[in-house]
Amino acid sequence: KGKTAILIDDMIDTGGTICSGANLLKKEGAKRIFACASHAVFSPPSYERLSSKDLFEQVIVTNSIPVIDNYDFPQLKVLSVANMLGEAIWRIHEESSVSSMFR
């Protein structure tokens, strides 16, 4: 109760799982709820579920899957993975360590 909750998942597709978790946390008294996922599949009806103004303080995803232009709401933050992927490709080409990027 009264705490900040961070929900982390590998992907958000319809938003059902992450919204169910957020609703439970809200019911238990979470003060703020953040959702984070690597891949934003965003199939219908995810927009309606995620953009609810009273559920998430912020929904944070990467652009590993392009987020369509008209899929925008105030709580959505899309982080670019372009530099990291470019660096990984370069290291593979140069036959150097990719794992050292994450140490």
Identify the residue ranges that each predicted region occupies.
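PRPP-associated nucleotide enzymes
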Residues: 1-103
